[in-house]
Each structure stands twice: as C-alpha cells, then as structure tokens.
Curated annotation (Swiss-Prot):
GO biological process entries: translation
Top-level taxon of the source organism: Bacteria
Pfam families, per database record: Ribosomal_L12, Ribosomal_L12_N
UniProt xrefs under NCBIfam families: L12
Gene assigned in the entry: rplL
Stated name of the protein: Large ribosomal subunit protein bL12
InterPro entries: Ribosomal_bL12 (IPR000206), Ribosomal_bL12_C (IPR013823), Ribosomal_bL12_C/ClpS-like (IPR014719), Ribosomal_bL12_oligo (IPR008932), Ribosomal_bL12_oligo_N_sf (IPR036235)
UniProt function note: Forms part of the ribosomal stalk which helps the ribosome interact with GTP-bound translation factors. Is thus essential for accurate translation.
CDD domains: Ribosomal_L7_L12
Amino acid sequence: MALDTDKIIEELKGASILELNDLVKAIEDEFDVTAAAPVAAAGAADAGAAKSEFDVELTEAGQEKVKVIKAVRDITGLGLKDSKDLVDGAPKNVKEGVSEDEANDIKAKLEEVGATVTLK
C-alpha cells in the first residue's frame, strides 16, 4: 500500500476544523503520541543553561578597608580615588561580565583581605 501524500493533503484541505481536530485526536489515540508543541521543553532547557558571565559585587568592605581599596585598585586598574569611592559606595560592582573563573579569582582576592563579595 503506497501513500500518495499529495492526495492526503488535498483531502485535508477540504476538511473543516472540527474534522481536522477529530483526525488529530484519532491519530494521537491510535499511535499513542501527542501533537503538543515542543516549545515548553525548549524553555525549560534554556532555564537550566549554565550562566557564562558574572558580575562581582563588593557587598561590604569589612574591617580592613585600606587593604580592600588596594585589592580593588589591583583588580580594576582604577586610580586610588576611584577605588576608594567604589569601596565607600558598597554595595557596588567591581567587575561586570567576567567568566566564572575570573569572578571566583576576584572574589577570593577580595575575601582574603576581609571584604564580603557576591557573584551575580
């Protein structure tokens, strides 16, 4: 038994919406499948995707503010005044859009001198 796709399509073009709906339900029942769109599955996959860029936020300078200012200056390349302003204005982003490894390195350096850091 050979299927003539063109004939089937022509028959479907002449069917009403109700007839097509019944056909879809019958096919789902007969072959134990669903005609649901895979959009929901794709959305769930995107939600679970690993984050590739991080922002390093200085949440609090801690007790050793001078050491934190020096560390911020080394990390960012900012001048002394800009580094001090950043530390004084905490919570502020020290670096934005960096890789996970770089973000963790920066976090470790800042926590080593007593700062509280959050990765976003």
